C-alpha cells in the first residue's frame, strides 16, 4: 500500500497571488494579441510558488513563472478575461497535446498526434526553439474569476503554449464566466509535437516540488496538463455560463523533468434555439483552457474508501478533503479543487439542449499510467484519457461533471484517483475517474464519465501511441495514447446535427478514449462543492491487463437530486467510420487489448437519475438520489451523431434509486477484464420528429414528477459479474442506449421500467458479430416518450460469482414492477422484464454490444395488449483496426465496436420475445415507438435451421452470409431448398444395353426384352412372351368378375407362378391387362434362366396339365384353357427383333431366346449373330463344316461346274489352232520363184518398141511441161510426178505434138524398156545395168 505523503502542492495563497493579476487586467482591443514574455523567462512555474498570471502592468509572472513575448499583448475584442486567462494558462503549458482533434483539423495532425503521444510517453524534450511563442497572460475582470481565484491552482508550471487554432467568443447577455480563445496554430505543427527542453523543465521546477519528487521510489516530474475544456460558444453572441469545467492533468516522467502543457483539447457546440443566443464552442489542438471554479462552494464531506485486493496486495483509496487551505498532513490536491472542476452550461429553453461540459484534472502517476479525464459533451458523457506516465508517486485525478440548470449550475465535486505502485511489474490498472456534480436548489443535474467522444459529425482517432517498455519488469501502459478526433459542424468547428426540422442544430464534438496501464491505482475522491454526500471510490488491480475502474458518486443537494455515471466513450473516425483502437504493449509481450468504439445514440435524459457502474474486480458501491425538487430546471443536452458518419456513443441506461431504496451488490473475484461503463441520462425536452440515416435520439417534452424509469442491462465480465440495482425517480425522457466498450462488459442492475402505452412495439435484434453496421438504422418518434426496457445480456464465463441485486422502490414513483435476474450461471442468463402500465411512450435506442462469451440468453418482455410484433434487425459490428488485440483469459481477440439501432414502428404492440443467443450473438427485447426505421436490412433469423427448410432429406446448415442457412442436398436433388431433381441419366449410370429413365429423385435402368438386370448387368434370360385377348364369352365370367385390372393381373401372375414353379430356372411371370370396350388384352411375360433349356413346348405342355387339374381360380383356369396355345412361337421375335438377315437367317424364339437361325447352306460362328455365312468358293457345308468341292466343281456349296467346261474347251480349241497353222505353212512353201517382169509382160498385149535400134539419149533436162526433178543425195533417184504422165488412148497420138516435142520422150513404166502406156515405145531413161534398174524398180 502506498504510504501517505506530505502535500506536494503550493498553498492556496500562492495561487491567489498568481490569479490576482488576471482579475485586474482589462480586456484588450480586438484583434490584438497579448505580448509574449521573453524567451529568457521560458521556465516552469515553481510548484511550491504561487501561480499568478501577469496583470496589466505585469509583464512577467511571479517567481519562476516563465513568460514569453509574442506579437502583441492585446486581447481581441469581445474576448472575455476568461479567454485571456485560458490563453495564459495554455501558453504556459508545454506538454504535448494529446486530445481529440477538432473537426477542422486535418488528418495531417493525426500523425503529429501520434508522435506527440510517443513523445509524451517517452517524455522526449526538445529545444526551446521548437515551442511556439507563448501569448501573455491576460487578466480576467469577471466576478467569477475572483471567486475562482479563491480556488487552489496547483503546480501550474510555466505553461508554454504553441500556436493553435484561434477560437474567439464574444460576450453575450448571459453571464459568461469565460470565453475561450486560443491563438491560431500553424498547420505544420500538431499539438503532439510541442516539446520542452530539459533546461526549461528544470529551471521552472521549484525546490519544494523536486523535494517531493525525490521522495518517490522513482524519480519523476509532475506534468501539469490542461486536459481540455468543453466550451459552449454561441453562434451569434457566444456566451458561457458559469462553471466551465477544465481538466488538468499532471504527469510524471522518469526523466525527472516537469512538463506542463495542454494534453488535449475538446470542442463542443450546442446551438440553442433562437430564444437564447446560440452558443457553440470549439477548442483546437494545443489549446488548453483552465477555468477556475466558483469558490462559493467550499463545504466538502468525507468519502467512503473501498479497498480491493488483487494478487494479495491490498489497495487503499483515500478520501481527500477539499478546502480552501490544503492540509499538509493529508495527501491531497486541494489546489486543483477549484481549477479543474468547473462546469459550463448554457441557459436555454426547455426545447433545446443545454451545453454542458466537464473536465477533469488528471494526475498521471504510477508506472506510466495515469488517467486524464476529459470533458463531458452534450451527451452528458465525460471521457477519460489514459496515458502512460513515469513512475508514480500517487496519482490524483480531478473529475468534474457538467451541470445543467438555469444558469445556476453549482461547482462540481471532483474525484481524485491516486495510484500507488503497490503491485509489482507486470500489473497495471486503467482507472476511471469519479465525477460528481452538484446543482443549486431547484436544479437537477446529471453527470457522467464519458469516454472521449468525437463529434457527431465524425471522430478521428488518430493517435495510437506505442507504449514504451519500462525497466524493472514493469509493464508500460498505453502511454499517452489518445484518439485525436475531429468533427465537422455546419455552423461551427464541431459537428452539428439537426435534431429537429424546426429545432436549431446541435453540434457536438466527442473526444476519443485512450488507455494506460498502471501497476496499481488508489482512487481517492475529493469534493470541492457544498452539500456533497458520499462518494465511493473503488480501486482495482489487474495483473498484465488494464482494468477500467468505474466509479459512481451521488451527491445530494438541497431539494435537488443528482447523480453521476461513468461510461466508456467510443468514437469513430469521421471519414472512415471505423472504430479506432488503442493498443497496449508490455515488456513481457502480453497481448494488447484493443479498445473498440461503438457509435451510441444518446437521447435526452431524465432530469434526475442515478447510474451505477459495474466493473469486474471492483466493488461498485451504492448510489442514491433524492427526488428532484424542481425537475423542470434540469437541463440535460441531448445530442445526435451527425449523419455523415457513425458516431461514438456510450452505453447509457437511466436508473435511479429513490430515497429509502437499497441496493445490494456482490462482485465476483477480481479478473483482468476491462469493463464498459453505463451512462443513462434523462432530459425533459420535446422535439418534433426528426429522422436521420444515422444514430439519433428523440427528445420528449418535460413532465415533472413523472414515474421513475429504469432500464436493465446485464453483462458479464470474463470471470466476474456485478449487478448493481438502481432506480430512478425523475421525469422520464429519453433513454440512452447501453454501450459496451469491450468484449468484457459490465452489468447494470435490472430496475423498474415504465413501458410506453400504445406506441411501442417489440423489436428483436439479432446481431452476428461480423456484420457491417449501418448508421441509417434509426427511428424517431414525435410526442412524449418514456424509455422502455432495454435489456442487454451478455454471457458470463464459468466460475462467476453472481450478485442478485435487490431494489426497493419508493411509493412515490409510478407503478412499475421490479425486473429480476434469474439463473446467473455459467452458460445462460435469463432476464425477465415485466413492465407495467406505461406513462410516456419513448423511443428506446438499442445498443448491440459485442459479446465474446458463449451461451444461451433469453430475453422476454411482456406487454398488456395487442399481439406481439417483432422486427429482427441484424446490426453490424466492425472489428477494430489492425494491430490491436484484446486479451481475455489469456486469449487475444479482436473486439468489435457495438453499434446501436433505433427501430421504430407506427403500430405498437405488447412484447413477448424470446431469442436464443448462441456464441457471439445478442438478442434484445425492447419497445420502440412509431415511425418505421429507415433502410432496415433483411432479417436473418438466429437459427434458420430450427424448422428445416431443406426438402427431400436435405441437411440444413446455418450460414450467416446468405439467407442464414444453406442446404446440403442428397445426390438426387439440387437447388437452394433441394427441390430440383437431378437428371442422373445425363451421366449414363446404366450398364450397356440398358435404357436410363429419370424419375423424381432417382432413375431406373431398363434392360431390353429378353434381358434382365442382375448385379448391374443386363444378362440374357429365356423370355417367353405372349399376347392374347379374351373372347366375349369370357367377359362375363372373368373380366367382369374382376373390375379392377390390377386384381386380374395379380391373379393371372399368381396362377402362372404356381404353374411354372416346378420348371428348372424359373424366375417369374408378369401380366398386364388392358381393357377395351368389348375385349380385354392380356400380355404375359415369363422368364427363365438361360441355363434352364426350357422351350416353348415345355411351357405349353405345363399350362395344359395345370389347366386340366386347375387348383386356382376357375375363371383363370378357364381363361388359360380357352387359349389353344398361350405362348406361341414368334411372339418374342415380334417384340424383340434381333434384326436377323432375312436372306441368310430367320428369327426363332422357341427356346425363349430370340435368335437368328441360318438357312440351309449357311452357318454361324456365334449363335447370337444376326446373320449367317456360307462356305467359301470351292467348299461346301457338310455337317456344319465347309468341305472342298470335287474336281471341276466350284461356287456355293460346289454347285458351279465352270472348271470342267474350261478344261474341255481349252483342249479342243488348242488342237484346232494347231492344224490351221500347219496348213498355212505348207501353202506358203509351194509358191513360184519367177521374175516379176515375166509376170507382168506375160500377156500378149505387150509389144516391143519400134525404136529398139535408137541409141541412148542423155537425160533430158525437161520432161513435159514440168521438169522432172532429179537429184542425188547419196543415191540417185528419179522422181516422176504422175501429173507429168499423159495417158493417151492408143492410136490417138498427135504426130504434130510429137514433132514439136510436146509429148514426153518416155511414158512407159520406169523399169521397162518399153512404155506400158504407149506400147512399142522405147524408154530413153532405161539403164541396162542392174544397179540402175534397182533404183527404178
Swiss-Prot record:
Q: What is its main location?
A: membrane
- Keyword terms, alphabetized: Calcium, Cell junction, Cell membrane, Developmental protein, Disulfide bond, EGF-like domain, Glycoprotein, Membrane, Phosphoprotein, Repeat, Signal, Transmembrane, Transmembrane helix
Bias category Gly residues: which stretches? 470-480
The source's domain of life comes to Eukaryota
The protein, known as: Protein HEG homolog 1
Its biological purpose: Receptor component of the CCM signaling pathway which is a crucial regulator of heart and vessel formation and integrity. May be acting by stabilizing endothelial cell junctions.
Q: What Gene3D superfamilies does the entry give?
A: Laminin
- The gene that this protein is the product of is Heg1
Q: Which organism is it from?
A: Mus musculus (Mouse)
Where is it localised? Answer: Cell membrane; Cell junction
Gene Ontology CC, one term: external side of plasma membrane
- How does a null allele present? Some mutant animals die in utero, but most die postnatally, about half before weaning as a result of pulmonary hemorrhage. Midgestation mutant embryos show cardiac defects characterized by invagination of the ventricular cavity into, and often through, the compact layer of ventricular myocardium. The septal myocardium is similarly honeycombed by endothelial-lined extensions from the ventricular cavity, a defect accompanied by the presence of ventricular septal defects in most late-gestation embryos.
List, as start-end ranges, the regions of compositional bias called Basic and acidic residues: 885-896
Q: Which molecular function term from Gene Ontology is one that the record holds?
A: calcium ion binding
Cytoplasmic-side stretches of the chain, per the record, are 1226-1337
- What are the transmembrane regions? 1205-1225
Q: How does it sit in the membrane?
A: Single-pass type I membrane protein
| Subunit composition and interactions | Interacts with CCM2 and KRIT1; KRIT1 markedly facilitates interaction with CCM2.
- Name which cysteines form disulfide bonds: 945-956, 950-967, 969-978, 985-996, 990-1005, 1007-1018
Amino acid at each position: 500500500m502506498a504510504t501517505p505523503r506530505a502535500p506536494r502542492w503550493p498553498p492556496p495563497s500562492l495561487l491567489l497571488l498568481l490569479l490576482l493579476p488576471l482579475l485586474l487586467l482589462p480586456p484588450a482591443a480586438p484583434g490584438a494579441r497579448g505580448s509574449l514574455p521573453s524567451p529568457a523567462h521560458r521556465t516552469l512555474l515553481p510548484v511550491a510558488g504561487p501561480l499568478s498570471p501577469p496583470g496589466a502592468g505585469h509583464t512577467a509572472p511571479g517567481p519562476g513563472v516563465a513568460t514569453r513575448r509574442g506579437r502583441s499583448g492585446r486581447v481581441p475584442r469581445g474576448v472575455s478575461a476568461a479567454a485571456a486567462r485560458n490563453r495564459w494558462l495554455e501558453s504556459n503549458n508545454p506538454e504535448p497535446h494529446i486530445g481529440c482533434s477538432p473537426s477542422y483539423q486535418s488528418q495531417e495532425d493525426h500523425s503529429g498526434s501520434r508522435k506527440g503521444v510517443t513523445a509524451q510517453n517517452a517524455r522526449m524534450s526538445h529545444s526551446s526553439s521548437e515551442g511556439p511563442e507563448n501569448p501573455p497572460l491576460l487578466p480576467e475582470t469577471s466576478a467569477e474569476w475572483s471567486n475562482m481565484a479563491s480556488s487552489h491552482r496547483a503546480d501550474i508550471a510555466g505553461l508554454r503554449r504553441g500556436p493553435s487554432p484561434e477560437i474567439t467568443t464574444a460576450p453575450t447577455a448571459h453571464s459568461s464566466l469565460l470565453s475561450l480563445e486560443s491563438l491560431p496554430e500553424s498547420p505544420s505543427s500538431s499539438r503532439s509535437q510541442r516539446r520542452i527542453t530539459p533546461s526549461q523543465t528544470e529551471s521552472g521546477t521549484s525546490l519544494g516540488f523536486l523535494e517531493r519528487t525525490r521522495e518517490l521510489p522513482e524519480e519523476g516530474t509532475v506534468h501539469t496538463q490542461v486536459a481540455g475544456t468543453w466550451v459552449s460558444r454561441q453562434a451569434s453572441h457566444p456566451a458561457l455560463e458559469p462553471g466551465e469545467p477544465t481538466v488538468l492533468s499532471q504527469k510524471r516522467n522518469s526523466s525527472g523533468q516537469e512538463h506542463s502543457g495542454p494534453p488535449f483539447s475538446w470542442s463542443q457546440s450546442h446551438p440553442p434555439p433562437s430564444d437564447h443566443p446560440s452558443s457553440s464552442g470549439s477548442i483546437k489542438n494545443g489549446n488548453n483552457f483552465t477555468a477556475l471554479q466558483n469558490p462559493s462552494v467550499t463545504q466538502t464531506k468525507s468519502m467512503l474508501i473501498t479497498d480491493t485486493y488483487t494478487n494479495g496486495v491490498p489497495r487503499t483509496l483515500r478520501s481527500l478533503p477539499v478546502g480552501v487551505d490544503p492540509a499538509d498532513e493529508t495527501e491531497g490536491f486541494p489546489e486543483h479543487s477549484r481549477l479543474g472542476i468547473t462546469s459550463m452550461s448554457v441557459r436555454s429553453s426547455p426545447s433545446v439542449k443545454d451545453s454542458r461540459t466537464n473536465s477533469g484534472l488528471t494526475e498521471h502517476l504510477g508506472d506510466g499510467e495515469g488517467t486524464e479525464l476529459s470533458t463531458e459533451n452534450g451527451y452528458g458523457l465525460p471521457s477519460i484519457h489514459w496515458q502512460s506516465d513515469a513512475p508514480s508517486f500517487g496519482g490524483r485525478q480531478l473529475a468534474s461533471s457538467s451541470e445543467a440548470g438555469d444558469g445556476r449550475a453549482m461547482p462540481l465535486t471532483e474525484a481524485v484517483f491516486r495510484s500507488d505502485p503497490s503491485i509489482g511489474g507486470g500489473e497495471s490498472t486503467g482507472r476511471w475517474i469519479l465525477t460528481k456534480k452538484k446543482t443549486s436548489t431547484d436544479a437537477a443535474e446529471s453527470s457522467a464519465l464519458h469516454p472521449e467522444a468525437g463529434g457527431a459529425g465524425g471522430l478521428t482517432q488518430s493517435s495510437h501511441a506505442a507504449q514504451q517498455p519500462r525497466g524493472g519488469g514493469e509493464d508500460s501502459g498505453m502511454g499517452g495514447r489518445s484518439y485525436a478526433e475531429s468533427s465537422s459542424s455546419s455552423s461551427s468547428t464541431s459537428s452539428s446535427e439537426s435534431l429537429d426540422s424546426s429545432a436549431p442544430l446541435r453540434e457536438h464534438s466527442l473526444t476519443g478514449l485512450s488507455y494506460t496501464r498502471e501497476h496499481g491505482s488508489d482512487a481517492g475522491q475529493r469534493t470541492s462543492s457544498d452539500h456533497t454526500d458520499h462518494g465511493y471510490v473503488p480501486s482495482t488491480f489487474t495483473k498484465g491487463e488494464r482494468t477500467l475502474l468505474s466509479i459512481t458518486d451521488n451527491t445530494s443537494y438541497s431539494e435537488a437530486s443528482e447523480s453521476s455515471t461513468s461510461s466508456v466513450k467510443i468514437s469513430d473516425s469521421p471519414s472512415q467510420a471505423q472504430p479506432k483502437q488503442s493498443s497496449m504493449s508490455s515488456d513481457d509481450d502480453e497481448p494488447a487489448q484493443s479498445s473498440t468504439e461503438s457509435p451510441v445514440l444518446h437521447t435526452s435524459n431524465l432530469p434526475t437519475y442515478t447510474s451505477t457502474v459495474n466493473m469486474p474486480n471492483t466493488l461498485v458501491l451504492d448510489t442514491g438520489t433524492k427526488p428532484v425538487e424542481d425537475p423542470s430546471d434540469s437541463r440535460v443536452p441531448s445530442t445526435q451523431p451527425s449523419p455523415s458518419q457513425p458516431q461514438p456513443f456510450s452505453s447509457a441506461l437511466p436508473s435511479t434509486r429513490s430515497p429509502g431504496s437499497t441496493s445490494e451488490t456482490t462482485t465476483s473475484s477480481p479478473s483482468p477484464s476491462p469493463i464498459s461503463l453505463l451512462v443513462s441520462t434523462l432530459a425533459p425536452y420535446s422535439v418534433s420528429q426528426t429522422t436521420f440515416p444515422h444514430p439519433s435520439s428523440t427528445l420528449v417534452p418535460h413532465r415533472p414528477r413523472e414515474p421513475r424509469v429504469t432500464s436493465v442491462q446485464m453483462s458479464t465480465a470474463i470471470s466476474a459479474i456485478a449487478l448493481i440495482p438502481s432506480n430512478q425517480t425523475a421525469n422520464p425522457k429519453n433513454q440512452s442506449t447501453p454501450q459496451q466498450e469491450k468484449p468484457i462488459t459490465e452489468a447494470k442492475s435490472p430496475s423498474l421500467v415504465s413501458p410506453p402505452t400504445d406506441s411501442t412495439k417489440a423489436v428483436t435484434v439479432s446481431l452476428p458479430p461480423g456484420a457491417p453496421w449501418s448508421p441509417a438504422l434509426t427511428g424517431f418518434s414525435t410526442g412524449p416518450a418514456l424509455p422502455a426496457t432495454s435489456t442487454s445480456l451478455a454471457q458470463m464465463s464459468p466460475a462467476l460469482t453472481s450478485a442478485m441485486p435487490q431494489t426497493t422502490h419508493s411509493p412515490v414513483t409510478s407503478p412499475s414492477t421490479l425486473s429480476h435476474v434469474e439463473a446467473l450461471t455459467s452458460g445462460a442468463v435469463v432476464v425477465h422484464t415485466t413492465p407495467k402500465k406505461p406513462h410516456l411512450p419513448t423511443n428506446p435506442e438499442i445498443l448491440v454490444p459485442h459479446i465474446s462469451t458463449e451461451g444461451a440468453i433469453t430475453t422476454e418482455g411482456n406487454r398488456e395488449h395487442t399481439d406481439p410484433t417483432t422486427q429482427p434487425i441484424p446490426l453490424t459490428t466492425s472489428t477494430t483496426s489492425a494491430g490491436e488485440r484484446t486479451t481475455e483469459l489469456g486469449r487475444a481477440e479482436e473486439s468489435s465496436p457495438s453499434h446501436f439501432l433505433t427501430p421504430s414502428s407506427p403500430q405498437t404492440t405488447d412484447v413477448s420475445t424470446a431469442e436464443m443467443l448462441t456464441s457471439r450473438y445478442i438478442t434484445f427485447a425492447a419497445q420502440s415507438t412509431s415511425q418505421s426505421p429507415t433502410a432496415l436490412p433483411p432479417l436473418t433469423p438466429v437459427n434458420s435451421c430450427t424448422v428445416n427448410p431443406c426438402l427431400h432429406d436435405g441437411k440444413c446448415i446455418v450460414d450467416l452470409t446468405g439467407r442464414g442457412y444453406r442446404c446440403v442436398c442428397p445426390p438426387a436433388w439440387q437447388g437452394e431448398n433441394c427441390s430440383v431433381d437431378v437428371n442422373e441419366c445425363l451421366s449414363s449410370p446404366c450398364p450397356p444395353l440398358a435404357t436410363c429413365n429419370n424419375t423424381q429423385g432417382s432413375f431406373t435402368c431398363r434392360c431390353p426384352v429378353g434381358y434382365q438386370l442382375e448385379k448391374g448387368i443386363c444378362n440374357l434370360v429365356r423370355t417367353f412372351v405372349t399376347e392374347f385377348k379374351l373372347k366375349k364369352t369370357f367377359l362375363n365370367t372373368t373380366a367382369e368378375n374382376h373390375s379392377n385390372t390390377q386384381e386380374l393381373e395379380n391373379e393371372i401372375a399368381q396362377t402362372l407362378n404356381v404353374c411354372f414353379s416346378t420348371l428348372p430356372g424359373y424366375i417369374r411371370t408378369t401380366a398386364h391387362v388392358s381393357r377395351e370396350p368389348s375385349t380385354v388384352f392380356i400380355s404375359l411375360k415369363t422368364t427363365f434362366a438361360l441355363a434352364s433349356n426350357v422351350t416353348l413346348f415345355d411351357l405349353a405342355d405345363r399350362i395344359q396339365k395345370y389347366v386340366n387339374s386347375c387348383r386356382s381360380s376357375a375363371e383363370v383356369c378357364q381363361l388359360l384353357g380357352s387359349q389353344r396355345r398361350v405362348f406361341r412361337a414368334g411372339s418374342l421375335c415380334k417384340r424383340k427383333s434381333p434384326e436377323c438377315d432375312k436372306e441368310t437367317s430367320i428369327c426363332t424364339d422357341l427356346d425363349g431366346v430370340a435368335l437368328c437361325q441360318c438357312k440351309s447352306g449357311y452357318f454361324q460362328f456365334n449363335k447370337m449373330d444376326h446373320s449367317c455365312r456360307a462356305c467359301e468358293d470351292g467348299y461346301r457345308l457338310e455337317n456344319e463344316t465347309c468341305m472342298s468341292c470335287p474336281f471341276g466343281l466350284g461356287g456355293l456349296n460346289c454347285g458351279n461346274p465352270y472348271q470342267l467346261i474350261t478344261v474341255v474347251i481349252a483342249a479342243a480349241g488348242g488342237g484346232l489352232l494347231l492344224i490351221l497353222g500347219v496348213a498355212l505353212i505348207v501353202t506358203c512353201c509351194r509358191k513360184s520363184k519367177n521374175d516379176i517382169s515375166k509376170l507382168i509382160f506375160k500377156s500378149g498385149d505387150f509389144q516391143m518398141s519400134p525404136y529398139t535400134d535408137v541409141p541412148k539419149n542423155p537425160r533430158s533436162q525437161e520432161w513435159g511441161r514440168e521438169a522432172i526433178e532429179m537429184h542425188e543425195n547419196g543415191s540417185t533417184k528419179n522422181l516422176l510426178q504422175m501429173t507429168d504422165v499423159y495417158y493417151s488412148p492408143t492410136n490417138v497420138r498427135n504426130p504434130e505434138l510429137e514433132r514439136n516435142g510436146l509429148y514426153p520422150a518416155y511414158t512407159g513404166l520406169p523399169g521397162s524398156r518399153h512404155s506400158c502406156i504407149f506400147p512399142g515405145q522405147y524408154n530413153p531413161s532405161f539403164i541396162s545395168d542392174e544397179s540402175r534398174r534397182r533404183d527404178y524398180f
